[in-house]
């Protein structure tokens, strides 16, 4: 930047005037030390208050420390545009040129426009914002379009003031409405609108700054962007306006009159050891102390709000706990009642069971006894019926009898008979029978006195006569072994389906001279 400005001395850039060194300026020299006529003193006071609010609005954030080192440190400039020492006054003829006017375009570059006049552009834009008031509403878009038209219509703007020839920066309507408004009396506002160019460019010598200055321009205040502090100011002003413990911001920006502080602010000022300001305008020390006190009050309000919310949350939780506890107790009571009722019902059920068993056990036992008796009688009747049918079943009755051999009778059977006979009956041992286990020897058949052989059934034994009993057994065995073998279609138990006897095929044999027995 120095290389760009070397071919252009201060006399060529600003003929007939000298400009101040930017290294000697601080944050309070741009907006607080401008000299205006007496009828514009209110504007100077308003600009001083506005500059202080604008510069310190960055430190209103409660996140920052109260004793921020940024408040006491010296701000550095990017690069000073002018290094030479100049006088502290400007005449109407030597107003600084606008970057819109070409000054030897063959020797200058775009860096000069953005470097040497960047601070002036931002400064003038801040001053233009401050002029807006409720008495004269200005549309930002219309004003910017009008200023742009005027700039295009009149290229040489050397005769205009820096405030009037710089366009208003474009901002959203919401941001423009949030700017603090300075109340001004109508007569003074009309006088401000009629000022001349000579009155605007008259500037007194700047007193030495509190931060000091250096010849090489290493320390100078940085240019503050106009749009960035607007939003924090809007947020803080909204918080202040909603709090009853803080004074409204428009009351602190008055030019004259008494200053009415809240009781909380006064108490905090006394506790911090600061004097209580009573009149406007405020000094820098008073303003700094008041800002610190207001910041503490804001922190206190936010802490109270957080504690209030926490208390409400805890109270809500306590109410829920009480409600749930009462419901739990009621449920426990219901459970105990149900358990008691269950025990009572169980006892009644046991009593009923004992009563029922005591009353029903005797008839049940009697019925069971009667049933058993009936079954036994039925079984006995069945046995009797079977017993009555036993004579009709020779096969069943003959199988259970035991054959007794009589050795004397067996010898007499196979002995040669002295009596003449047609044939000799014999039993072939080679021919199998269906009852091999009951084979017996042939016994002599001698019918007893008064006994006749029945062809349809077995002979009925007579135990009173031993001889007759033996003869009956021998006759029965003879008839069993000498008859025809059973057919092939007999059942497994050896019984024939029909009890018809085969035809007679045996020969007659004379047993004696007097008796002849016909065997079947």
UniProtKB/Swiss-Prot annotation:
<dbReference type="GO" id="GO:0046332">
    <property type="term" value="F:SMAD binding"/>
</dbReference>
<feature type="compositionally biased region" description="Polar residues">
    <location>
        <begin position="235"/>
        <end position="245"/>
    </location>
</feature>
<dbReference type="GO" id="GO:0045944">
    <property type="term" value="P:positive regulation of transcription by RNA polymerase II"/>
</dbReference>
<keyword id="KW-0805">Transcription regulation</keyword>
<feature type="domain" description="bZIP">
    <location>
        <begin position="289"/>
        <end position="352"/>
    </location>
</feature>
<feature type="region of interest" description="Disordered">
    <location>
        <begin position="201"/>
        <end position="258"/>
    </location>
</feature>
<dbReference type="GO" id="GO:1902236">
    <property type="term" value="P:negative regulation of endoplasmic reticulum stress-induced intrinsic apoptotic signaling pathway"/>
</dbReference>
<feature type="compositionally biased region" description="Polar residues">
    <location>
        <begin position="86"/>
        <end position="97"/>
    </location>
</feature>
<keyword id="KW-0325">Glycoprotein</keyword>
<keyword id="KW-0539">Nucleus</keyword>
<dbReference type="GO" id="GO:0001227">
    <property type="term" value="F:DNA-binding transcription repressor activity, RNA polymerase II-specific"/>
</dbReference>
<feature type="cross-link" description="Glycyl lysine isopeptide (Lys-Gly) (interchain with G-Cter in SUMO2)">
    <location>
        <position position="183"/>
    </location>
</feature>
<feature type="region of interest" description="Leucine-zipper">
    <location>
        <begin position="331"/>
        <end position="352"/>
    </location>
</feature>
<keyword id="KW-0010">Activator</keyword>
<dbReference type="GO" id="GO:0001228">
    <property type="term" value="F:DNA-binding transcription activator activity, RNA polymerase II-specific"/>
</dbReference>
<dbReference type="GO" id="GO:0005783">
    <property type="term" value="C:endoplasmic reticulum"/>
</dbReference>
<keyword id="KW-0804">Transcription</keyword>
<keyword id="KW-0834">Unfolded protein response</keyword>
<keyword id="KW-1017">Isopeptide bond</keyword>
<feature type="region of interest" description="Disordered">
    <location>
        <begin position="72"/>
        <end position="98"/>
    </location>
</feature>
<feature type="compositionally biased region" description="Basic and acidic residues">
    <location>
        <begin position="501"/>
        <end position="511"/>
    </location>
</feature>
<feature type="glycosylation site" description="N-linked (GlcNAc...) asparagine">
    <location>
        <position position="498"/>
    </location>
</feature>
<dbReference type="InterPro" id="IPR046347">
    <property type="entry name" value="bZIP_sf"/>
</dbReference>
<dbReference type="GO" id="GO:0030278">
    <property type="term" value="P:regulation of ossification"/>
</dbReference>
<keyword id="KW-0238">DNA-binding</keyword>
<keyword id="KW-1133">Transmembrane helix</keyword>
<keyword id="KW-0735">Signal-anchor</keyword>
<dbReference type="GO" id="GO:0016020">
    <property type="term" value="C:membrane"/>
</dbReference>
<keyword id="KW-0472">Membrane</keyword>
<feature type="topological domain" description="Lumenal">
    <location>
        <begin position="397"/>
        <end position="520"/>
    </location>
</feature>
<dbReference type="GO" id="GO:0007095">
    <property type="term" value="P:mitotic G2 DNA damage checkpoint signaling"/>
</dbReference>
<dbReference type="GO" id="GO:0006357">
    <property type="term" value="P:regulation of transcription by RNA polymerase II"/>
</dbReference>
<feature type="transmembrane region" description="Helical; Signal-anchor for type II membrane protein">
    <location>
        <begin position="376"/>
        <end position="396"/>
    </location>
</feature>
<dbReference type="GO" id="GO:1903671">
    <property type="term" value="P:negative regulation of sprouting angiogenesis"/>
</dbReference>
<feature type="compositionally biased region" description="Low complexity">
    <location>
        <begin position="209"/>
        <end position="222"/>
    </location>
</feature>
<keyword id="KW-0832">Ubl conjugation</keyword>
<dbReference type="GO" id="GO:0001649">
    <property type="term" value="P:osteoblast differentiation"/>
</dbReference>
<feature type="region of interest" description="Disordered">
    <location>
        <begin position="484"/>
        <end position="520"/>
    </location>
</feature>
<dbReference type="GO" id="GO:0005789">
    <property type="term" value="C:endoplasmic reticulum membrane"/>
</dbReference>
<dbReference type="GO" id="GO:0010629">
    <property type="term" value="P:negative regulation of gene expression"/>
</dbReference>
<dbReference type="Pfam" id="PF00170">
    <property type="entry name" value="bZIP_1"/>
</dbReference>
<feature type="region of interest" description="Basic motif">
    <location>
        <begin position="291"/>
        <end position="320"/>
    </location>
</feature>
């Amino acid at each position: 930047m120095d290389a760009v400005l070397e071919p252009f001395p201060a006399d060529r850039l600003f003929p007939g005037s000298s400009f101040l060194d930017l290294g000697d300026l601080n944050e309070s020299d741009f907006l607080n030390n401008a000299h205006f006529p007496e009828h514009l003193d209110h504007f100077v006071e308003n600009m001083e208050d506005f500059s202080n609010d604008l510069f310190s609005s960055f430190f209103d954030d409660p996140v920052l420390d109260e004793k921020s080192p940024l408040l006491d440190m010296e701000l550095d400039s990017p690069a000073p545009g002018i290094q030479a020492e100049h006088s502290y006054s400007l005449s109407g003829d030597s107003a600084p040129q606008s970057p819109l006017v070409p000054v030897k375009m063959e020797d200058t570059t775009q860096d000069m426009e953005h470097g040497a006049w960047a601070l002036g552009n931002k400064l003038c834009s801040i001053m233009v914002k401050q002029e807006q008031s409720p008495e004269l509403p200005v549309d930002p878009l219309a004003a910017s379009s009008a200023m742009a038209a005027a700039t295009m219509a009149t290229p040489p703007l050397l005769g205009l003031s820096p405030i009037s020839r710089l366009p208003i920066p474009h901002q959203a309507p919401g941001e423009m409405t949030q700017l603090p408004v300075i109340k001004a009396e109508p007569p003074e506002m009309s006088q401000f609108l009629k000022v001349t160019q000579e009155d605007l460019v008259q500037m007194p010598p700047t007193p030495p700054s509190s931060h000091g200055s250096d010849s090489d321009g290493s320390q100078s205040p940085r240019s503050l962007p106009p749009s960035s502090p607007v939003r924090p100011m809007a947020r803080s002003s909204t918080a202040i306006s909603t709090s009853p413990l803080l004074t409204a911001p428009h009351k602190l920006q008055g030019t004259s009159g008494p200053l009415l502080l809240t009781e909380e602010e006064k108490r905090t000022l006394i506790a911090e050891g600061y004097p209580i300001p009573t009149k406007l305008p405020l000094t820098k020390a008073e303003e700094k102390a008041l800002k610190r006190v207001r910041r503490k009050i804001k922190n206190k309000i936010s802490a109270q709000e957080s504690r209030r919310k926490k208390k409400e949350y805890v109270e809500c939780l306590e109410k829920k706990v009480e409600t749930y506890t009462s419901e739990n107790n009621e449920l426990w009571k219901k459970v105990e009642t149900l358990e008691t009722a269950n025990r009572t019902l169980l006892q009644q059920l046991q009593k009923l069971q004992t009563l029922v068993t005591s009353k029903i056990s005797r008839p049940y036992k009697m019925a069971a006894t009667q049933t058993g008796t009936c079954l036994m009688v039925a079984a006995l009747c069945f046995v009797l019926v079977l017993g009555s049918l036993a004579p009709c079943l020779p096969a069943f009755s003959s199988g259970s009898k035991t054959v007794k051999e009589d050795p004397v009778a067996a010898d007499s059977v196979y002995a040669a008979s002295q009596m003449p006979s047609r044939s000799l009956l014999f039993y072939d041992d080679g021919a199998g029978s269906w009852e091999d286990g009951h084979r017996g020897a042939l016994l002599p058949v001698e019918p007893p006195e008064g006994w006749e052989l029945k062809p349809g059934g077995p002979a009925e034994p007579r135990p009173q006569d031993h001889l007759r009993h033996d003869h009956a057994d021998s006759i029965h065995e003879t008839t069993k072994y000498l008859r025809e073998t059973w057919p092939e279609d007999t059942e497994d138990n050896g019984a024939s389906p029909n009890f018809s006897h085969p035809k007679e095929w045996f020969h007659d044999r004379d047993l004696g001279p007097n008796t002849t027995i016909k065997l079947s």
